Design a protein with these regions (language model features):
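Mid/C-terminal beta-alpha module of Rossmann-like enzyme folds, strongest
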Residues: 193-245, 277-286
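N-terminal Rossmann NAD(P)H-binding glycine-rich loop of SDR-like oxidoreductase domains
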Residues: 3-23
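Amphipathic terminal alpha-helices
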Residues: 260-286
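Glycine-rich NAD(P)-binding loop of the Rossmann-fold in SDR/ketoreductase-type enzymes
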Residues: 77, 81-92, 126, 130, ...
C-alpha cells in the first residue's frame, strides 16, 4: 500500500511511518522538516490547506494517517490553530478524498471525555471541558469509508524534549510519584501502528475505541516502564492526590485485532527500542 503519514516526525508519527515502511509499504511523510527515516518527505506546514490538497490530489495514496495535533497547553495558548488542526483538518481530509480510494485514519484521544463519569464507549457523548478536549472532539470523523481510532498513547520519542509520559519517566532518577487514582486505558504507539495496518487490511471504518477493555492506573503503568526500561532502579511512590478515570471501552466486535495486555505492550515497546537504538540515544536503558 501507498501511505501518507501527516506529522511523520512526532512521537506517534515517526514510529507509525517507520513501522509501515518496515512492513514493505511505500510510505511518504509530511512534516515541517524532512524525516531521516523515510525516502520521501513532503516538507510543509499542515495549516497550508492548498498544499495538503495538492499532495492528496497528486499522491494516489491508499491511506492517509493523520498524526497531526496541537496538544494540551499548546492548544490553550493557540486556539485558532487548535481549531484548524485538531478540529477542521480531519474533516477537510475526508472532504477532499470523498471521490478517491484514499482512506483517512485519524487519531483521537481519551481527552474528549472529562474523566468523572467513565467508562466511555464509542457512542458516549464527549464532555471534556478544556479547549484541547473540545477541539479534539470536534475533529472525530465517523463515516463508512474512513476511520477514527480513539485512544490514549504512550511510546518512545525521537525528540529528547518530547512531552509524553514515557519521555518524562526516562529522564527521572531516584524517586518519582505515581498516581494511583489516575485510571488509564491506552496503547503503545507500536500497538497502534500494528492496529492501523490491520484496520486497513480489514477495511475497518467509523469510530473505534482501540483498547483492551481493561484499565490500569498510572502508578502501575510507571511500574511497567520501570521493569522493562530501567531495571527497577526508580523508586515509585504511590500518590492518591489525582482522581481521574478516562477509561475507554469498546462495544464493537467487527475488528480482528486484539490489543495485548499492558505488560505485553510495554515488553514489545522495549523490543522496538532495542531494534532501533540509533533513534533513541537519549534513553538510559538497563
Amino acid at each position: 500500500m501507498k501511505i501518507l503519514v501527516l506529522g511523520c516526525n512526532g512521537m506517534a508519527g515517526h514510529l507509525i511511518s517507520l513501522y509501515f515502511k518496515e512492513q514493505g509499504h511505500e510510505v511518504v511523510g509530511f512534516a515541517r522538516s524532512a524525516s531521516h527515516l523515510l525516502d520521501k518527505t513532503i516538507v510543509g506546514d499542515a495549516s497550508n490547506m492548498s498544499l495538503i490538497k495538492q499532495t492528496l490530489d497528486e499522491g494516489n495514496f491508499d491511506a492517509v494517517i493523520n498524526c497531526i495535533g496541537l496538544l494540551n497547553q499548546f492548544a490553550e495558548n493557540n486556539k485558532a490553530m487548535a481549531v484548524l488542526l485538531n478540529g477542521y483538518l480531519p474533516h477537510y481530509l475526508v472532504e477532499i478524498t470523498k471521490s478517491m480510494k484514499t482512506k483517512i485514519i485519524h487519531m483521537s484521544t481519551d481527552c474528549v471525555f472529562a474523566g468523572n463519569d467513565g467508562p466511555y464507549y464509542e457512542d458516549s457523548l464527549p464532555n471534556g471541558s478544556t479547549f484541547y478536549d473540545r477541539s479534539k472532539a470536534m475533529g472525530e470523523i465517523n463515516n463508512d469509508k474512513d476511520l477514527t481510532f480513539r485512544n490514549s498513547i504512550v511510546g518512545p520519542d525521537i525528540k529528547e524534549s518530547g512531552i509524553g509520559l514515557f519521555n518524562w519517566f526516562m529522564k527521572q532518577n531516584g524517586e518519582v510519584g505515581g498516581y494511583t487514582g489516575a485510571i488509564w486505558t491506552g496503547v503503545t504507539t507500536f500497538t497502534l501502528a500494528k492496529a492501523m495496518e490491520q484496520a486497513l487490511k480489514e477495511n475497518l471504518t467509523g469510530l473505534y475505541n482501540l483498547v483492551n477493555n481493561e484499565s490500569i492506573n498510572k502508578y502501575d503503568l510507571l511500574g511497567l516502564f520501570n521493569k522493562y526500561f530501567r531495571g527497577g532502579e526508580i523508586i515509585i511512590n504511590p500518590n492518591d492526590k489525582l482522581q481521574l478515570d478516562k477509561s475507554l471501552r469498546s462495544k464493537r466486535d467487527d475488528f480482528g485485532f486484539v490489543v495485548p495486555s499492558y505488560e505485553q505492550q510495554i515488553k514489545e515497546m522495549r523490543e522496538w527500542v532495542d531494534a532501533h537504538p540509533s533513534l533513541y540515544p537519549h534513553y538510559k536503558l538497563f
